[in-house]
């Protein structure tokens, strides 16, 4: 089964289970201790700039990509926001099922880590309140149910991309051997926001820089480092246990 089909099945199952953040999840680092995007990252492109022309061209590209039914379906699936949904979808590039039941230490790391890093763009979102492409052009998106809610939520930077990029970086540290697959999947998650019509390309690009810039701040937190060691140990244990099972299955 390919990654697109698995993503669609995953989001359906998570939706049925009413996936949500645990109410008691706390960030490792408070938002005001993270790098301030307003102090170091540029404002969104001016509407008369060459950079904005590129944003428009990418929006047009995104609409052509909707003709690919499989890619469009992936863009819809990647409109997921909860850590539970996202972790299940990242399981394939990670190489192991990620869930509260199967990998509690890894899930704890993701819940707290993503909650921390996704806030890195919140201040910029409120400050710029950039208009989203579908709203600017008065055109439909791939997820109509989200249009009204997001119309009053700033476009720059992309929150979905921030969550996906944060999850990829956390999982890469747990399983470095899967780094290429994880980063590729997170990259496509960002592009899905362009394809779906919710974000400009510069929104997506900004999120990856902001999250990458904030990630080192996690390493100053002792609780994060302890949780990372637990997640790494859990992964190694499960991976080691899976090898004998795979060997036995191959001999049958």
Report the location of each language-model feature:
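Bacterial N-terminal signal peptides that target proteins for export
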Residues: 2-8
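Short alpha-helix boundary/capping motifs
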Residues: 151-154, 195, 199, 210, ...
């Amino acid at each position: 089964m390919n990654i697109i089909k698995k993503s669609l099945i995953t989001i359906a199952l998570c939706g049925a289970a009413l996936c949500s953040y645990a109410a008691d999840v706390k960030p490792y680092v408070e938002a005001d201790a993270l790098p301030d995007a307003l102090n170091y990252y540029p404002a969104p492109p001016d509407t008369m700039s060459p950079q904005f022309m590129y944003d428009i061209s990418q929006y047009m590209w995104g609409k052509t990509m909707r003709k690919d039914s499989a890619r469009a379906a992936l863009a819809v699936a990647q409109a997921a926001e909860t850590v539970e949904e996202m972790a299940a979808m990242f399981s394939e590039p990670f190489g192991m099922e990620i869930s509260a039941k199967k990998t509690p230490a890894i899930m704890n790391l993701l819940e707290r880590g993503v909650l921390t890093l996704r806030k890195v763009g919140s201040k910029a979102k409120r400050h710029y309140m950039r208009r989203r492409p579908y709203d600017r052009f008065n055109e439909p998106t791939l997820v109509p149910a989200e249009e009204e809610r997001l119309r009053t939520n700033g476009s720059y930077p992309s929150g979905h991309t921030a969550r996906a990029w944060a999850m990829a970086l956390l999982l890469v540290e747990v399983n470095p051997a899967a780094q290429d697959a994880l980063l590729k999947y997170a990259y496509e998650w960002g592009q899905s926001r362009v394809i779906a019509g919710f974000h400009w390309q510069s929104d997506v690009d900004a999120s990856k820089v902001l999250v990458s810039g904030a990630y080192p701040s996690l390493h100053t937190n002792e609780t994060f480092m302890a949780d990372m060691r637990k997640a790494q140990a859990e992964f190694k244990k499960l991976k080691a246990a899976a090898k004998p099972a795979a060997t036995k299955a191959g001999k049958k």
